[in-house]
């Protein structure tokens, strides 16, 4: 059953081929037998099995929804009343939220079973999932390599067949990069399509929740459940949500694919370049028109992103002071010492680095030179991408410049870690939807293909990704067989 698509799982559950209890117990067993992946921070076995029993009764009555009885995992920055929400940080190691995030409520209403919460880079800051207070996540394809970050636990859980699907967040590539490293599919929706209420903030103008699954078809099914207006989120957009599952099956004709030359630089591994060119040839053989495009501002993507992201992180994380909630230092005799020591003890090195960077660029002496300038550049980047997407349906390229690197290889070189996001951050800066799907292997490690499209064009984006997966088998590869 672990190799079923979500649609197949749903059909099998509705046809009573196996029960939700059996499926949930199977997932629990897989999680327990793959603890070395370190994909999960918390597991809610008893409650998951209780909910599975209830789901079986609903399914028996014939009133089940598409996700009824299907287990799932949540990145540990979505608030849940039952389980702690740690953000993989000592600062929130014992924090239990008083409410559920909006997407948690939506999944519960649609009958999905939250089996546990996954490991991540602390406060979603990282590209390798080595910055977690609870230890690094291992890649199911090679346990000596990273799973990607910051949603590495969710990606590893799906790639390792521990759960059928999982939810992550994407601030600069934190869904797409782990999806690429782990050989699965993942989408960052348009900013505002999915509610951020109850998702602990890293950089509020960049953060967006999205799903991990094996295929674009599965992503469509999950996204339909997640998307929609939420009055509790001031950035949520009120618009009609298409039936993504139905629309990906529509014929995909006359695709115009933009291919940026800047995506094929020397620092991009040759095996990745070859795999992307093979994908382009396949699209061309299927009738797509390939258009060479020039993204002149691409060299500014990463510096612009890190100025803005760190500035917003500095502001958002100022609330963790040891007074209202979170870690409280025991070695303090004054208020200033309490705040200083609580933050020094509670935050890890990467989080401290980004807070310091953000505080610096927001300071009175550097605000205009860095933060204000970055915001102006962000607008130019957005305008360039939107103008380009007026002449093409999607922008195609590699998700990452390398395959998954070894654990510890880049941990002392933050710049190299930041450059892992070189192709992904633009979608966040512009608020555009982007999907990563598997497109081959290099030295037995997965390669990801990224497709980026116009605002709120997830239906077209997923249809093109699904079209590609109907003519390839990369998304069906299994790390357990590879090993």
From Swiss-Prot:
One of its GO terms (biological process) is translation. It catalyses: L-glutamyl-tRNA(Gln) + L-glutamine + ATP + H2O = L-glutaminyl-tRNA(Gln) + L-glutamate + ADP + phosphate + H(+). The keyword rRNA-binding does not apply. The keyword Magnesium does not apply. PROSITE patterns: AMIDASES (PS00571). It comes from the Bacteria. Transmembrane segments: none annotated. Its EC number is 6.3.5.7. Keywords: ATP-binding, Ligase, Nucleotide-binding, Protein biosynthesis. One of its GO terms (molecular function) is ATP binding. One of its GO terms (cellular component) is glutamyl-tRNA(Gln) amidotransferase complex. The active site is at 75 (charge relay system), 150 (charge relay system), 174 (acyl-ester intermediate). Heterotrimer of A, B and C subunits. Belongs to the amidase family. GatA subfamily. PANTHER family: GLUTAMYL-TRNA(GLN) AMIDOTRANSFERASE SUBUNIT A (PTHR11895:SF151), TRANSAMIDASE (PTHR11895). This is Glutamyl-tRNA(Gln) amidotransferase subunit A. It comes from Legionella pneumophila subsp. pneumophila (strain Philadelphia 1 / ATCC 33152 / DSM 7513). The gene is gatA.
């Amino acid at each position: 059953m672990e190799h079923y698509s979500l649609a197949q799982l749903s059909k099998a559950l509705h046809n009573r081929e196996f029960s939700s209890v059996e499926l949930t117990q199977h997932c629990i067993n897989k999680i327990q037998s793959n603890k070395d992946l370190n994909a999960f921070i918390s597991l809610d076995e008893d409650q998951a099995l209780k909910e599975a029993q209830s789901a079986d009764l609903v399914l028996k009555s014939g009133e089940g929804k598409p996700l009824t009885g299907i287990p799932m995992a949540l990145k540990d920055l979505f608030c849940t009343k039952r389980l702690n929400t740690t953000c993989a940080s000592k600062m929130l190691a014992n924090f239990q939220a008083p409410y559920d995030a909006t997407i948690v409520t939506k999944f519960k209403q649609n009958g999905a079973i939250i089996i546990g919460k996954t490991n991540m880079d602390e406060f979603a800051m990282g590209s390798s999932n080595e910055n977690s207070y609870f230890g690094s996540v291992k890649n199911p394809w090679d346990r000596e390599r990273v799973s990607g970050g910051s949603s590495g636990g969710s990606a590893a859980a799906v790639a390792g067949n521990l759960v059928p699907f999982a939810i992550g967040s994407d601030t600069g590539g934190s869904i797409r990069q782990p999806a690429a490293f782990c050989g699965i599919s993942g989408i960052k929706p348009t900013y505002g399509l999915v509610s951020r209420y109850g998702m602990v903030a890293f950089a509020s103008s960049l953060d967006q929740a999205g799903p991990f699954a094996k295929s674009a078809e599965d992503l469509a099914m999950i996204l339909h459940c997640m998307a929609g207006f939420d009055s509790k989120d001031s950035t949520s957009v009120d618009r009609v949500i298409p039936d993504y599952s139905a629309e990906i099956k529509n014929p995909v004709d006359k695709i115009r694919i933009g291919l940026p030359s800047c995506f094929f630089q020397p620092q991009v591994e040759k095996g990745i370049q070859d795999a992307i060119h093979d994908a382009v040839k396949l699209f061309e053989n299927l009738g797509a028109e390939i258009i060479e495009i020039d993204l002149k501002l691409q060299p500014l993507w990463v510096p612009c992103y890190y100025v803005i992201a760190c500035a917003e992180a500095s502001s958002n994380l100022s609330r963790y002071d040891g007074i209202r909630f979170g870690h409280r230092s025991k070695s303090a005799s004054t208020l200033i010492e309490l705040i200083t020591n609580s933050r020094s003890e509670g935050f890890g090195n990467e989080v401290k680095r980004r807070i310091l960077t953000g505080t610096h660029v927001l300071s009175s002496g550097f605000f205009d030179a860095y933060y204000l300038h970055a915001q102006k550049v962000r607008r130019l980047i957005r305008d360039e991408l939107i103008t380009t997407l007026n002449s093409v349906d999607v922008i195609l390229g590699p998700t990452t410049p390398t395959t998954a690197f070894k654990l510890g290889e880049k941990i002392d070189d933050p710049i190299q870690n930041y450059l892992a996001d070189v192709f992904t951050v633009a979608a966040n800066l512009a608020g555009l939807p982007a999907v990563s799907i598997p497109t081959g292997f290099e030295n037995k490690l997965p390669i990801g293909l990224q497709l980026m499209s116009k605002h709120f064009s997830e239906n077209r984006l997923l249809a093109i990704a699904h079209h590609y997966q109907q003519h390839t088998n990369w998304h069906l590869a299994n790390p357990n067989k590879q090993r």
